[in-house]
Amino acid sequence: MAVQIENLGSLDRKMTLEFARADLAKAREARLAKVGKSMKMAGFRPGKVPKNLVEKQHGMQVDFELQFDKAAELFYELAQKEGVALAGQPRLEPKSEIDAEKVVFDAFFEVLPEVKIGDFSKAEVTKYTTDIGEAEIDRALDALRKQQVHYHPRGEAGPHGDGGSNTAAQNGDQVVINFVGKIDGVEFAGGKAENFECVLGEGRMLPEFEAATLGLKVGESKSFPLSFPADYHGKDVAGKTAEFTITVKSVNWAHLPVVDDAFALSLGVTEGGVTKMRAEVKENLDREVKRRVTTLLKSEVMDKLNSLCELDVPKSLVASEQERLVEGARQDLMQRGVPNAKDAPIPAEIFAEQATKRVRLGLILSELVKNQNLIATADQIKAEIDEQATTYEDPKEVIRWFYRNPGRLKDIENLVLEDNVIKYFTSQAKVNDKSVTFEELSKLN
Protein backbone atom coordinates (compact mmCIF):
# COMPACT_ATOMS: atom_id res chain seq x y z
CA MET A 1 0.00 0.00 0.00
CA ALA A 2 1.07 3.60 -0.51
CA VAL A 3 2.31 5.11 2.72
CA GLN A 4 0.78 8.42 3.73
CA ILE A 5 2.94 10.33 6.23
CA GLU A 6 1.86 13.84 7.15
CA ASN A 7 4.24 16.36 8.71
CA LEU A 8 2.53 17.89 11.75
CA GLY A 9 5.46 19.90 13.05
CA SER A 10 9.16 19.73 13.81
CA LEU A 11 9.14 16.09 14.91
CA ASP A 12 5.44 15.18 14.93
CA ARG A 13 4.13 12.97 12.16
CA LYS A 14 0.90 11.18 11.25
CA MET A 15 0.71 7.97 9.26
CA THR A 16 -2.60 6.71 7.89
CA LEU A 17 -3.00 2.94 8.06
CA GLU A 18 -5.53 0.89 6.11
CA PHE A 19 -6.20 -2.83 6.04
CA ALA A 20 -9.10 -5.05 5.02
CA ARG A 21 -11.41 -6.43 7.69
CA ALA A 22 -11.17 -9.75 5.85
CA ASP A 23 -7.48 -9.90 6.81
CA LEU A 24 -8.56 -10.42 10.42
CA ALA A 25 -11.19 -13.11 9.79
CA LYS A 26 -9.03 -16.14 10.59
CA ALA A 27 -7.39 -14.48 13.58
CA ARG A 28 -10.83 -13.41 14.85
CA GLU A 29 -12.21 -16.92 14.61
CA ALA A 30 -9.18 -18.35 16.40
CA ARG A 31 -9.29 -15.71 19.15
CA LEU A 32 -13.02 -16.27 19.80
CA ALA A 33 -12.46 -20.03 19.89
CA LYS A 34 -9.73 -19.55 22.49
CA VAL A 35 -11.97 -17.29 24.57
CA GLY A 36 -14.79 -19.81 24.30
CA LYS A 37 -12.65 -22.62 25.73
CA SER A 38 -12.39 -20.86 29.08
CA MET A 39 -15.70 -18.98 29.06
CA LYS A 40 -18.22 -19.71 31.80
CA MET A 41 -21.94 -19.03 31.47
CA ALA A 42 -24.90 -20.17 33.49
CA GLY A 43 -26.60 -23.19 31.91
CA PHE A 44 -23.50 -24.39 30.07
CA ARG A 45 -20.46 -26.43 31.02
CA PRO A 46 -17.17 -24.47 31.04
CA GLY A 47 -15.85 -24.23 27.49
CA LYS A 48 -19.12 -25.39 25.92
CA VAL A 49 -20.81 -22.00 25.43
CA PRO A 50 -22.27 -21.74 21.88
CA LYS A 51 -20.28 -19.67 19.38
CA ASN A 52 -23.05 -17.13 18.88
CA LEU A 53 -23.09 -16.35 22.60
CA VAL A 54 -19.30 -16.09 22.72
CA GLU A 55 -19.52 -13.75 19.74
CA LYS A 56 -22.24 -11.67 21.38
CA GLN A 57 -20.36 -11.22 24.66
CA HIS A 58 -16.76 -10.92 23.45
CA GLY A 59 -16.92 -10.08 19.74
CA MET A 60 -16.47 -6.32 20.08
CA GLN A 61 -13.55 -6.67 22.50
CA VAL A 62 -11.83 -9.20 20.23
CA ASP A 63 -12.33 -6.90 17.22
CA PHE A 64 -10.86 -4.01 19.17
CA GLU A 65 -7.77 -5.97 20.24
CA LEU A 66 -7.14 -7.50 16.81
CA GLN A 67 -7.52 -4.20 14.99
CA PHE A 68 -5.08 -2.44 17.30
CA ASP A 69 -2.60 -5.34 17.05
CA LYS A 70 -2.85 -5.28 13.26
CA ALA A 71 -2.48 -1.49 13.14
CA ALA A 72 0.63 -1.63 15.33
CA GLU A 73 2.13 -4.44 13.24
CA LEU A 74 1.43 -2.56 10.02
CA PHE A 75 2.80 0.69 11.43
CA TYR A 76 6.19 -0.78 12.36
CA GLU A 77 6.38 -2.67 9.06
CA LEU A 78 5.77 0.50 7.04
CA ALA A 79 8.01 2.64 9.25
CA GLN A 80 10.88 0.23 8.68
CA LYS A 81 10.17 0.08 4.96
CA GLU A 82 10.20 3.89 4.70
CA GLY A 83 13.30 4.24 6.89
CA VAL A 84 11.49 6.28 9.54
CA ALA A 85 13.68 6.94 12.61
CA LEU A 86 11.12 6.53 15.37
CA ALA A 87 11.33 8.30 18.71
CA GLY A 88 9.16 6.23 21.02
CA GLN A 89 5.92 4.39 20.37
CA PRO A 90 3.01 5.61 18.21
CA ARG A 91 -0.41 6.65 19.46
CA LEU A 92 -2.98 4.71 17.45
CA GLU A 93 -6.43 6.18 16.87
CA PRO A 94 -9.14 4.39 14.82
CA LYS A 95 -11.08 6.49 12.36
CA SER A 96 -14.55 7.29 13.64
CA GLU A 97 -16.25 6.38 10.33
CA ILE A 98 -17.16 2.71 10.09
CA ASP A 99 -16.37 0.99 6.80
CA ALA A 100 -17.71 -2.49 6.15
CA GLU A 101 -14.72 -3.44 4.00
CA LYS A 102 -11.71 -1.84 5.63
CA VAL A 103 -10.29 -0.51 8.89
CA VAL A 104 -8.49 2.84 8.99
CA PHE A 105 -6.20 4.08 11.76
CA ASP A 106 -4.20 7.24 12.26
CA ALA A 107 -0.82 6.69 13.88
CA PHE A 108 0.61 9.76 15.60
CA PHE A 109 4.32 9.56 16.36
CA GLU A 110 7.58 11.47 16.63
CA VAL A 111 10.75 11.01 14.63
CA LEU A 112 14.29 11.38 15.90
CA PRO A 113 15.65 14.88 15.37
CA GLU A 114 18.56 16.04 13.28
CA VAL A 115 21.45 16.78 15.63
CA LYS A 116 23.59 19.74 14.62
CA ILE A 117 27.01 19.28 16.17
CA GLY A 118 28.68 22.56 17.13
CA ASP A 119 32.29 23.67 16.75
CA PHE A 120 34.15 22.05 19.64
CA SER A 121 37.33 23.99 18.89
CA LYS A 122 35.66 27.08 20.36
CA ALA A 123 35.04 25.36 23.69
CA GLU A 124 37.25 25.40 26.79
CA VAL A 125 37.22 22.90 29.64
CA THR A 126 39.29 22.47 32.79
CA LYS A 127 41.15 19.28 33.62
CA TYR A 128 42.27 19.13 37.24
CA THR A 129 45.48 17.48 38.38
CA THR A 130 46.35 16.45 41.93
CA ASP A 131 49.52 14.89 43.32
CA ILE A 132 49.26 12.60 46.32
CA GLY A 133 52.17 13.08 48.70
CA GLU A 134 53.04 12.11 52.26
CA ALA A 135 50.84 14.86 53.74
CA GLU A 136 47.75 13.54 51.94
CA ILE A 137 48.55 10.00 53.09
CA ASP A 138 48.95 11.22 56.69
CA ARG A 139 45.57 12.99 56.57
CA ALA A 140 43.92 9.86 55.20
CA LEU A 141 45.48 7.78 57.97
CA ASP A 142 44.25 10.30 60.56
CA ALA A 143 40.72 9.84 59.20
CA LEU A 144 41.13 6.06 59.50
CA ARG A 145 42.44 6.44 63.05
CA LYS A 146 39.38 8.51 63.98
CA GLN A 147 37.19 5.62 62.83
CA GLN A 148 38.80 3.55 65.62
CA VAL A 149 38.67 6.26 68.27
CA HIS A 150 37.75 5.30 71.81
CA TYR A 151 37.26 7.49 74.86
CA HIS A 152 38.52 7.53 78.46
CA PRO A 153 37.30 9.64 81.39
CA ARG A 154 39.42 12.74 81.85
CA GLY A 155 41.55 12.59 84.98
CA GLU A 156 41.20 8.83 85.51
CA ALA A 157 44.33 6.74 85.04
CA GLY A 158 44.06 4.05 82.38
CA PRO A 159 46.16 2.00 79.95
CA HIS A 160 46.60 5.10 77.75
CA GLY A 161 47.07 7.67 80.52
CA ASP A 162 44.63 10.11 82.11
CA GLY A 163 44.27 12.67 79.32
CA GLY A 164 46.29 15.31 81.15
CA SER A 165 45.81 17.38 84.26
CA ASN A 166 43.04 19.54 82.79
CA THR A 167 39.75 17.75 83.43
CA ALA A 168 37.54 20.43 81.86
CA ALA A 169 35.73 19.72 78.58
CA GLN A 170 37.81 20.54 75.50
CA ASN A 171 37.33 20.40 71.74
CA GLY A 172 37.42 16.79 70.61
CA ASP A 173 36.13 15.49 73.94
CA GLN A 174 33.08 13.30 74.19
CA VAL A 175 30.66 14.79 76.71
CA VAL A 176 27.42 13.58 78.22
CA ILE A 177 25.08 16.32 79.43
CA ASN A 178 21.61 16.92 80.77
CA PHE A 179 19.87 20.10 79.68
CA VAL A 180 16.57 21.84 80.21
CA GLY A 181 15.18 24.93 78.53
CA LYS A 182 12.52 27.30 79.83
CA ILE A 183 10.60 30.22 78.32
CA ASP A 184 9.27 32.65 80.92
CA GLY A 185 10.18 30.08 83.55
CA VAL A 186 8.14 27.27 81.94
CA GLU A 187 9.61 24.17 80.30
CA PHE A 188 8.59 23.59 76.68
CA ALA A 189 8.24 20.52 74.48
CA GLY A 190 11.54 19.31 73.04
CA GLY A 191 13.60 21.57 75.30
CA LYS A 192 14.78 18.90 77.71
CA ALA A 193 17.10 15.89 77.44
CA GLU A 194 19.10 13.59 79.67
CA ASN A 195 22.32 11.74 78.90
CA PHE A 196 22.75 13.60 75.62
CA GLU A 197 26.07 12.49 74.13
CA CYS A 198 28.15 14.35 71.57
CA VAL A 199 31.72 15.21 70.60
CA LEU A 200 32.66 18.86 71.00
CA GLY A 201 33.79 20.47 67.77
CA GLU A 202 31.84 18.16 65.46
CA GLY A 203 28.93 20.57 65.16
CA ARG A 204 26.21 18.19 66.33
CA MET A 205 25.13 20.64 69.02
CA LEU A 206 24.04 24.21 68.49
CA PRO A 207 26.99 26.63 68.78
CA GLU A 208 25.53 28.12 71.98
CA PHE A 209 25.47 24.66 73.59
CA GLU A 210 29.06 23.90 72.61
CA ALA A 211 30.28 27.29 73.83
CA ALA A 212 28.57 26.78 77.19
CA THR A 213 29.90 23.22 77.60
CA LEU A 214 33.54 24.04 76.82
CA GLY A 215 35.54 24.46 80.02
CA LEU A 216 33.03 22.76 82.31
CA LYS A 217 33.97 19.84 84.53
CA VAL A 218 31.89 16.86 85.62
CA GLY A 219 29.06 18.01 87.89
CA GLU A 220 29.27 21.66 86.86
CA SER A 221 26.31 23.54 85.37
CA LYS A 222 25.87 26.66 83.30
CA SER A 223 22.89 28.69 82.11
CA PHE A 224 22.69 30.72 78.91
CA PRO A 225 20.03 32.37 76.71
CA LEU A 226 19.13 31.00 73.28
CA SER A 227 16.99 32.98 70.83
CA PHE A 228 14.93 31.03 68.30
CA PRO A 229 14.58 32.64 64.85
CA ALA A 230 11.15 33.87 63.78
CA ASP A 231 10.96 31.21 61.05
CA TYR A 232 11.94 28.34 63.39
CA HIS A 233 10.02 25.15 62.58
CA GLY A 234 8.67 24.88 66.13
CA LYS A 235 5.89 27.47 66.15
CA ASP A 236 5.58 27.45 69.97
CA VAL A 237 9.11 28.78 70.40
CA ALA A 238 9.68 30.66 67.11
CA GLY A 239 10.82 34.23 67.75
CA LYS A 240 11.22 33.65 71.51
CA THR A 241 14.23 33.49 73.84
CA ALA A 242 14.72 30.48 76.09
CA GLU A 243 16.95 30.08 79.13
CA PHE A 244 18.85 26.80 79.00
CA THR A 245 20.73 25.12 81.82
CA ILE A 246 23.22 22.35 81.09
CA THR A 247 24.83 19.97 83.56
CA VAL A 248 27.90 17.94 82.61
CA LYS A 249 27.70 14.26 83.59
CA SER A 250 30.94 13.00 82.00
CA VAL A 251 33.94 14.29 80.06
CA ASN A 252 35.97 11.78 78.05
CA TRP A 253 39.12 12.41 76.04
CA ALA A 254 39.74 10.78 72.68
CA HIS A 255 42.44 8.17 72.26
CA LEU A 256 43.48 7.39 68.69
CA PRO A 257 45.41 4.25 67.75
CA VAL A 258 49.11 4.61 66.97
CA VAL A 259 50.10 4.20 63.33
CA ASP A 260 52.03 0.96 63.64
CA ASP A 261 51.97 -2.58 62.28
CA ALA A 262 49.10 -3.50 64.62
CA PHE A 263 47.05 -0.63 63.21
CA ALA A 264 47.90 -1.78 59.68
CA LEU A 265 46.74 -5.29 60.58
CA SER A 266 43.44 -3.89 61.89
CA LEU A 267 42.89 -2.44 58.41
CA GLY A 268 43.42 -5.81 56.75
CA VAL A 269 47.08 -5.35 55.79
CA THR A 270 48.41 -8.78 56.76
CA GLU A 271 51.93 -8.36 55.35
CA GLY A 272 54.29 -5.44 54.98
CA GLY A 273 53.09 -3.47 58.00
CA VAL A 274 53.05 0.33 57.89
CA THR A 275 54.99 0.55 54.62
CA LYS A 276 52.47 -1.62 52.78
CA MET A 277 49.57 0.20 54.45
CA ARG A 278 50.83 3.60 53.31
CA ALA A 279 51.32 2.24 49.78
CA GLU A 280 47.73 0.94 49.73
CA VAL A 281 46.39 4.24 51.07
CA LYS A 282 48.25 6.09 48.30
CA GLU A 283 46.85 3.68 45.73
CA ASN A 284 43.32 4.30 47.00
CA LEU A 285 43.84 8.07 47.00
CA ASP A 286 45.23 7.97 43.46
CA ARG A 287 42.17 5.99 42.40
CA GLU A 288 39.88 8.52 44.08
CA VAL A 289 41.71 11.38 42.36
CA LYS A 290 41.26 9.70 38.99
CA ARG A 291 37.56 9.10 39.66
CA ARG A 292 36.99 12.66 40.85
CA VAL A 293 38.93 14.26 37.99
CA THR A 294 37.06 12.12 35.46
CA THR A 295 33.69 12.98 37.01
CA LEU A 296 34.39 16.72 36.98
CA LEU A 297 35.68 16.66 33.40
CA LYS A 298 32.74 14.54 32.24
CA SER A 299 30.24 16.90 33.86
CA GLU A 300 31.81 19.94 32.19
CA VAL A 301 32.06 18.23 28.80
CA MET A 302 28.41 17.18 28.97
CA ASP A 303 27.37 20.75 29.77
CA LYS A 304 29.42 22.01 26.81
CA LEU A 305 27.88 19.41 24.49
CA ASN A 306 24.44 20.41 25.66
CA SER A 307 25.07 24.08 24.87
CA LEU A 308 27.04 23.61 21.63
CA CYS A 309 24.69 21.19 19.87
CA GLU A 310 21.28 22.04 18.45
CA LEU A 311 18.31 19.69 18.24
CA ASP A 312 14.60 19.44 18.91
CA VAL A 313 13.83 17.10 21.79
CA PRO A 314 11.12 14.44 21.24
CA LYS A 315 8.38 14.84 23.83
CA SER A 316 7.76 11.09 23.90
CA LEU A 317 11.35 10.34 24.91
CA VAL A 318 11.22 13.00 27.63
CA ALA A 319 7.99 11.50 29.00
CA SER A 320 9.54 8.02 29.08
CA GLU A 321 12.63 9.37 30.86
CA GLN A 322 10.44 11.16 33.40
CA GLU A 323 8.68 7.89 34.19
CA ARG A 324 12.05 6.18 34.66
CA LEU A 325 13.14 8.91 37.05
CA VAL A 326 9.87 8.65 38.98
CA GLU A 327 10.32 4.89 39.31
CA GLY A 328 13.93 5.43 40.39
CA ALA A 329 12.76 7.86 43.07
CA ARG A 330 10.24 5.30 44.34
CA GLN A 331 12.93 2.61 44.46
CA ASP A 332 15.13 4.98 46.45
CA LEU A 333 12.33 5.64 48.93
CA MET A 334 11.71 1.91 49.27
CA GLN A 335 15.39 1.27 50.03
CA ARG A 336 15.20 3.96 52.71
CA GLY A 337 12.29 2.13 54.30
CA VAL A 338 9.68 4.82 53.62
CA PRO A 339 6.16 3.36 54.16
CA ASN A 340 4.03 2.88 51.02
CA ALA A 341 6.91 4.13 48.86
CA LYS A 342 5.97 1.77 46.03
CA ASP A 343 2.78 3.76 45.38
CA ALA A 344 4.10 7.19 46.37
CA PRO A 345 2.39 9.95 44.31
CA ILE A 346 5.50 11.48 42.73
CA PRO A 347 4.59 13.97 39.97
CA ALA A 348 6.58 13.41 36.78
CA GLU A 349 6.69 17.17 36.18
CA ILE A 350 9.37 17.67 38.83
CA PHE A 351 11.77 15.69 36.63
CA ALA A 352 10.97 17.56 33.40
CA GLU A 353 14.21 19.57 33.25
CA GLN A 354 16.42 16.64 34.25
CA ALA A 355 14.69 14.29 31.81
CA THR A 356 14.99 16.79 28.94
CA LYS A 357 18.71 17.21 29.57
CA ARG A 358 19.24 13.44 29.69
CA VAL A 359 17.38 12.90 26.43
CA ARG A 360 19.28 15.73 24.72
CA LEU A 361 22.63 14.35 25.82
CA GLY A 362 21.65 10.81 24.84
CA LEU A 363 20.82 11.92 21.31
CA ILE A 364 23.99 14.02 21.06
CA LEU A 365 26.17 11.14 22.26
CA SER A 366 24.51 8.73 19.84
CA GLU A 367 25.18 11.12 16.96
CA LEU A 368 28.83 11.54 17.91
CA VAL A 369 29.38 7.81 18.40
CA LYS A 370 27.87 7.13 14.98
CA ASN A 371 29.59 9.92 13.08
CA GLN A 372 33.02 9.60 14.68
CA ASN A 373 32.96 5.80 15.08
CA LEU A 374 33.42 6.03 18.84
CA ILE A 375 32.09 2.54 19.54
CA ALA A 376 33.14 0.66 22.66
CA THR A 377 35.53 -2.14 21.73
CA ALA A 378 35.72 -5.47 23.54
CA ASP A 379 39.21 -4.55 24.77
CA GLN A 380 37.96 -1.27 26.23
CA ILE A 381 35.07 -3.00 27.98
CA LYS A 382 37.42 -5.63 29.41
CA ALA A 383 39.87 -2.96 30.61
CA GLU A 384 37.09 -1.05 32.39
CA ILE A 385 35.78 -4.20 34.09
CA ASP A 386 39.31 -5.22 35.13
CA GLU A 387 39.92 -1.78 36.65
CA GLN A 388 36.67 -1.80 38.59
CA ALA A 389 37.35 -5.33 39.81
CA THR A 390 40.71 -4.37 41.36
CA THR A 391 38.90 -2.50 44.14
CA TYR A 392 37.34 -5.74 45.44
CA GLU A 393 38.77 -8.55 47.51
CA ASP A 394 38.15 -11.19 44.81
CA PRO A 395 38.63 -9.48 41.42
CA LYS A 396 38.12 -12.68 39.42
CA GLU A 397 34.69 -13.26 40.93
CA VAL A 398 33.71 -9.63 40.23
CA ILE A 399 34.78 -10.04 36.60
CA ARG A 400 32.64 -13.17 36.29
CA TRP A 401 29.76 -11.27 37.92
CA PHE A 402 29.93 -8.62 35.18
CA TYR A 403 30.09 -11.08 32.31
CA ARG A 404 27.22 -13.20 33.64
CA ASN A 405 24.73 -10.36 33.22
CA PRO A 406 24.09 -8.65 29.85
CA GLY A 407 22.58 -5.65 31.64
CA ARG A 408 25.74 -5.03 33.64
CA LEU A 409 27.84 -5.40 30.49
CA LYS A 410 25.61 -2.84 28.78
CA ASP A 411 26.21 -0.40 31.64
CA ILE A 412 29.97 -0.81 31.20
CA GLU A 413 29.63 -0.35 27.43
CA ASN A 414 27.73 2.91 27.97
CA LEU A 415 30.41 4.08 30.39
CA VAL A 416 33.13 3.38 27.81
CA LEU A 417 31.10 5.17 25.12
CA GLU A 418 30.92 8.25 27.33
CA ASP A 419 34.68 8.08 27.91
CA ASN A 420 35.25 7.84 24.16
CA VAL A 421 33.10 10.91 23.57
CA ILE A 422 34.99 12.83 26.26
CA LYS A 423 38.33 11.89 24.72
CA TYR A 424 37.12 13.00 21.31
CA PHE A 425 35.73 16.28 22.66
CA THR A 426 38.92 17.13 24.57
CA SER A 427 40.97 16.34 21.47
CA GLN A 428 39.05 19.10 19.67
CA ALA A 429 38.51 21.65 22.45
CA LYS A 430 40.98 23.73 24.45
CA VAL A 431 41.85 21.96 27.69
CA ASN A 432 43.19 24.04 30.59
CA ASP A 433 45.15 22.02 33.14
CA LYS A 434 44.75 23.21 36.72
CA SER A 435 46.65 21.83 39.69
CA VAL A 436 44.73 21.63 42.98
CA THR A 437 45.27 19.96 46.33
CA PHE A 438 43.39 16.80 47.23
CA GLU A 439 41.30 18.78 49.72
CA GLU A 440 40.41 21.36 47.07
CA LEU A 441 39.57 18.62 44.59
CA SER A 442 37.22 16.99 47.10
CA LYS A 443 35.24 20.23 47.48
CA LEU A 444 34.75 20.87 43.76
CA ASN A 445 31.30 20.18 42.33
Curated annotation (Swiss-Prot):
Could you name the Gene Ontology cellular component terms for this entry?
Answer: cytoplasm
Domain of life, per lineage: Bacteria
What biological process terms from GO does the record include? Answer: cell division; protein folding; protein transport
Give its E.C. classification number. 5.2.1.8
Q: Name one GO molecular function term.
A: peptidyl-prolyl cis-trans isomerase activity
What does this protein's UniProt record list under function? Involved in protein export. Acts as a chaperone by maintaining the newly synthesized protein in an open conformation. Functions as a peptidyl-prolyl cis-trans isomerase.
The record, for HAMAP family, names: Trigger_factor_Tig
Recorded protein name is Trigger factor
- What is the protein's species of origin? Polynucleobacter necessarius subsp. necessarius (strain STIR1)
State the organism's lineage: Bacteria, Pseudomonadati, Pseudomonadota, Betaproteobacteria, Burkholderiales
Gene from which the chain derives:
tig
